[in-house]
From Swiss-Prot:
PROSITE patterns for the chain: TRP_SYNTHASE_BETA
Entry protein name: Tryptophan synthase beta chain
Cofactor(s) needed: pyridoxal 5'-phosphate
Documented EC number(s): 4.2.1.20
GO MF annotation: an example: tryptophan synthase activity
Pathway where this protein functions: Amino-acid biosynthesis; L-tryptophan biosynthesis; L-tryptophan from chorismate: step 5/5
Family note: Belongs to the TrpB family.
NCBIfam families in alphabetical order: trpB (TIGR00263)
HAMAP family reported for this sequence: Trp_synth_beta
Reactions catalysed, as given in the entry: (1S,2R)-1-C-(indol-3-yl)glycerol 3-phosphate + L-serine = D-glyceraldehyde 3-phosphate + L-tryptophan + H2O
Length: 428
């Protein structure tokens, strides 16, 4: 199969036929879901071998999504990163505003191939929910989105977008009322309605085949970026950097660079209020191997093996697990993972906005914060590629409250402007 954008199963790279990435992955699900998950695996294998599937997906990615996404050098931002050159892979410019549409269109096509008429999905920041609702509108599929009640409040704009697109949005009020609980409810729905429903899983976690399938639909990010940075900079980057929650945007960027051992693959996890506070979602930094949502990976858990509640200012990173391929990359030493606090991410968000006129999603801002530190380590000869996984429209209320940007917070806003002036002065 020849395809410019859909390039599954790179030769010689994991997973195994059983869905394992080293010791991680697999399929740990209730009996009621075995047939449905196996059907997804079988149909996906057929789709990978079907040139028409690749042709249709390529057409959607070009003419509907707007691929290839741009590669933007951010020179003023880079002045604060030790003078290293910094390039952004602009997934924020995709239709719906993030990388999520890549995977959603692929799975929507698969849903149609399976003859299913209804799609369910989980969402944290709302970007996967918006992308899913968009694809369902395009394909004429019924759509139900599960979203933690806390996330519906801090991402109210995306809730409105989903409903405008025709989706039913169900606020999950159990547990921590965030992404983990939305996934739990979506799995319950799938068990009850498996005959006509496909669970359009939004990240590279879950039972096999979802980690590999979602990765394959996102590989286009790294394939494009690798070609683009060679054209723009004349060489491969020293580091490819992405935020990590479940891990889909990061693995999409990383995968094309795995054979390039001179390229460091660096994921930036949410450290929340700080690792020492316990209020974070830094799974690879502070977690232990365990089973969550159908696969074995690193999980945030207590001494008795119970899942602990994650925290992040970013709704899209607020997850106590991680995709099994990231666990494999960590343990093999091929991937590096750092924890970034809320404060560091928000400062990076503001810095990119003020120096480049690009407002990133809070999720992506974690990667930007990481890039600032990595650039200082690499120095002026360094070259950094950052995946800007989404735009920040959805986060404006959070950012405005954090920085005091509303008129009622004028004194706080003045302090924020003063801080930026001081930062810019330090860089000169």
């Amino acid at each position: 199969m020849s395809s410019e954008f859909f390039i599954p199963d790179p030769e010689g790279q994991v997973p195994t036929a059983e869905g394992y990435f080293g010791a991680f992955g697999g399929k740990f699900i209730p009996e009621a879901l075995v047939a449905a998950v196996d059907e997804v695996a079988v149909e996906y294998d057929k789709a990978k071998a079907d040139p028409e599937f690749a042709r249709e997906l390529d057409d959607l990615l070009v003419h509907y999504t707007g691929r290839p996404s741009a590669l933007t050098e951010v020179s003023r931002f880079a002045e604060h990163a030790g003078g290293a050159r910094v390039f952004l892979k602009r997934e924020d410019l995709n239709h719906t505003g993030s990388h999520k549409i890549n995977n959603v269109l692929g799975q929507a096509l698969l849903t149609r191939r399976m003859g299913k008429t209804r799609v369910i999905a989980e969402t944290g920041a709302g970007q996967h929910g918006v992308a899913t609702a968009t694809a369902c509108a395009l394909f004429g599929l019924d759509c139900t989105i599960y979203m933690g009640e806390i996330d519906t409040q801090r991402q109210a704009l995306n809730v409105a977008r989903m409903r405008m697109l025709g989706a039913e949005v169900i606020a999950v009020k159990s547990g921590s009322r965030t992404l983990k609980d939305a996934i739990n409810e979506a799995f319950r729905d799938w068990v009850a309605n498996v005959d006509r429903t496909h669970y359009l899983f939004g990240t590279v976690a879950g039972p096999h085949p979802f980690p590999a399938m979602v990765r394959d639909f996102h590989r286009v990010i790294g394939v494009e970026a690798r070609r683009q940075i060679l054209e723009r900079a004349g060489r491969l980057p020293d580091a490819a950097v992405a935020c990590v929650g479940g891990g889909s945007n990061a693995i999409g960027l990383f995968h094309a660079f795995i054979p390039d051992t001179g390229v460091r693959l660096i994921g930036c996890e949410p450290a929340g209020h700080g690792l020492e506070t316990g209020e974070h979602a830094a799974t690879l930094t502070a977690g232990e191997p365990g089973i969550l949502h159908g696969s074995r990976s690193y999980v945030l858990q207590d001494d008795e093996g119970q899942i602990t509640e994650p925290y992040s200012i970013s709704a899209g990173l607020d997850y106590p697990g991680i995709g099994p391929e990231h666990a494999y990359l960590k343990d093999s030493g091929r991937g590096e993972y750092r924890a970034v606090t809320d404060d560091a991410a928000m400062q990076a968000l503001r810095l990119l906005s003020r120096t480049e006129g690009i407002i990133p999603a809070i999720e992506s801002a974690h990667a930007l914060a990481g890039a600032l530190e990595i650039g200082k380590e690499l120095g002026k000869d360094g070259l950094i590629l950052v995946n800007l996984s989404g735009r920040g429209d959805k986060d404006m209320d959070t950012a405005a409250r954090y920085f005091g940007l509303y008129d009622t917070d004028a004194s706080v806003a003045a302090d924020a402007d003063s801080d930026i002036a001081e930062i810019e002065g330090d860089a000169k």
